[in-house]
Every structure is written in structure tokens, then in C-alpha cells.
Amino acid sequence: SHYEGLKKIEMDVLRNNEVIGSTNYFFEFDEDLFVVKNYTNFKVELFGITVFSILSETIEKYKDDKLVFFKSNTFQNDKEKYVNLNYDKSINKFVIDGSSYKGEASLDCTIGNWWNHKIFKAEKQISPLSGSIKKQTVSLIGNENIDINGKEYLTKHFNIKSNDENLSDEKKFEFDVWYNPENNLILKVTYNKMGNWEYRLRSFE
């Protein structure tokens, strides 16, 4: 695995340049499985009232670099969302039981998480919150030097967007992602949806 030796990635979640929470990934090797756990927690407050919040726990398992298991539980504004995904060897597909999709998925789908550089090669991404599958188009914008916590990194700047015009505006997505090939890390993600959002690397070990 490209992530041998990596123990954790911590990212701040910002909205309109203000830190409102975090998303943290923890990596472990369990015999022949590579296991990634994620904890995400953030909330947007307006005049002291929480108007939007996410509290999420996920676990994904890989065998020989291939996804075999994914499970997530999320509270979005107190509404529960979930995904249970398993690789079914007999049909060579993923079987998903999610809050917004139940059924099969082909193996060219990648979970839409911000630790995994496979997202740049994927034609479809699975929502880690609800299990929905969306086709995506990935474009390389170019090489850019960016500053993260006072340190300069050379990155590849990608744009990832949903390419199904029939999706409602609410379900469409477009992300800009800055990836550092040297240490295989996604350093920064930005998008606009009711504000300017940014996921930014805080630390890794």
C-alpha cells in the first residue's frame, strides 16, 4: 500500500475562513487488511444557533489494495444517514445498503474520502454519508505551490465535479483538490455550497 507507515491525518474544516471542526483519519494494518477509520465533526452556528452540523464515524477495509468493506454512521442536523458496503466475491461487485441507495455497484467506484488519491482516477464516487453513487469528471488544473501551516508544498491541483446534468443543484458537486505526490497526501479541498468551505491539512504522522 502507498500508505505504509502512515498513522493518521488530521484536517481542519473551515467555512468562510473560520475553523468549525475537524475530520481525522486513522490508519492501521490488521493482518492482511488495511483499515482506515474516520471521525468528522463540525457545526455551523448563526447567532448562537446551530444551523448545520455533521457528526460522522466511518471505517473502511482494504485487502490487497482493494476495497472490501465500508461502514458509516452520520448525523446530519440530527437526521441519521448510513452506509453498509461489502464486496461480494460471487458477483465481483459491491453490495450497498445505504440511506439513499440500496443495490449493487461496480468496482470502479471509490469512496469519496479525502485521504485516498484513487479519487483522481475514479469515474464514480460513492457518498461516504449515504451510499449514493455519482459519476464524476476529474481535470488536472496544473502544478501549484501552496502554503499550509507555514510550509510550502508543490502540489497538483485537480478539479472534481459531478457530470450528471440531471442531478438537482443540491446533489451536484464540484471540488478543487490540492494533492502532494511526494508524501501522497491531499493537503487541501475547497468547494462552495452556502459558503466557502475548505478542508485543510493540520498534521500527519
Language model regions located:
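Acidic, serine/threonine-rich low-complexity disordered tracts
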Residues: 1-88, 118-205
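Hydrophobic, well-structured mid-protein blocks that either form specific transmembrane helices
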Residues: 70-112
